[in-house]
Amino acid sequence: MSPQRMKLSSPPVTNNEPTATASAVKSCGGGGKETSSSTTRHPVYHGVRKRRWGKWVSEIREPRKKSRIWLGSFPVPEMAAKAYDVAAFCLKGRKAQLNFPEEIEDLPRPSTCTPRDIQVAAAKAANAVKIIKMGDDDVAGIDDGDDFWEGIELPELMMSGGGWSPEPFVAGDDATWLVDGDLYQYQFMACL
């Protein structure tokens, strides 16, 4: 493949998606050296970085101090970004660079600007973000309130009694399902 063709295959950048530029990463990284944290930093959200094992973490440096306030470890970057916004607004006020400036009035406020109160308010903000499960370990962004599984029904399985047994849960190798608030055991049938 020619270098020109490789350049064209990169994803397009749209005007409504903020992206990190080389100068922004350089100014945050301190000097021109690339550190391990600059390669794990989220390209859009301030104060958010990704751990090697996939969790997103957030922390903020206290103004005029070398110490940092740990805000937490989260499954999605949006949760970490909300936690950062609460802390940044408390510590820096209206001058803070926020990830979601239009939502700052709706976020919880710490009672004081002590690290402990900031951590509590940041945790509340992060936990208010709804996430959608995409697979076993994958999560995707913010939930818009629609539940994917709401519209899926298996009437043949439920009506014919094909393995569905409303017995109380007994610990074992069988999978468990929560149906209408009650815990039922689903016994797998050999289909082969």
UniProtKB/Swiss-Prot annotation:
Coarse class of the primary localization is: nucleus
Gene Ontology BP term (one): ethylene-activated signaling pathway
Gene3D superfamilies referenced in this protein's UniProt entry, alphabetically: AP2/ERF domain (3.30.730.10)
What CDD domains has UniProt attached to this entry? AP2
Q: Which UniProt keywords apply?
A: Activator, DNA-binding, Ethylene signaling pathway, Nucleus, Transcription, Transcription regulation
Q: Where is this region: Disordered?
A: 1-43
Name a GO molecular-function annotation. DNA-binding transcription factor activity
Q: Which family does it belong to?
A: Belongs to the AP2/ERF transcription factor family. ERF subfamily.
**Protein name per Swiss-Prot or TrEMBL:** Ethylene-responsive transcription factor ERF023
Gene assigned in the entry: ERF023
